[in-house]
């Protein structure tokens, strides 16, 4: 019973986060709505768990002192693309699913948010664009590198960071189970913006 909670939280975030960011304390309604969205999202993930985005964000924040929300925002697009793949190398750990339904689920999210597309792939692409727009509207930079993280240091720590993200408690609940090499690839794409 988590879908409705997650969808409500998403819609509220898309509607009120830019206002809360822009207006701060002068817009108590937007701040209240964001507190509600945070609580509702917490209720959803307390039952449905998190996934590899949070795993990677935990390590990105720990290794490079980035706030957890920023780290999640930096990793979300790559995670969505990874999860939406039609033919994963390895499935998630929940055996009741014979294949991932994530592309379809992301399209449902797009529909709920009023994001259009002629098919599920187009809805996915438009959802990612909407997320990029939301991030830009609240001051989230485009890449990990944009936060001043030195390329050599990032590459030097990448293997350890990817291994720790793989072992993070959230990874097992991801709908598509990542290989360590796939986690590294997601980090690299998020670093360079590719």
Residue spans for each PLM region:
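Carboxylate- and glycine-rich phosphate/diphosphate-binding segment that chelates Mg2+/Mn2+
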Residues: 1-48
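Short coil/turn segments at secondary-structure boundaries
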Residues: 1-3, 29, 122, 145-148, ...
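Hydrophobic packing residues in well-ordered alpha-helices of helical domains and bundles
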Residues: 6, 31-34, 124, 158, ...
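Predominant activation on well-ordered alpha-helical scaffold segments within soluble catalytic domains
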Residues: 7-18, 35-39, 53, 57-61, ...
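Gly/Pro-rich interdomain helix-loop hinge
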Residues: 66, 70-153
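Short, amphipathic C-terminal "tail helix"
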Residues: 153-194
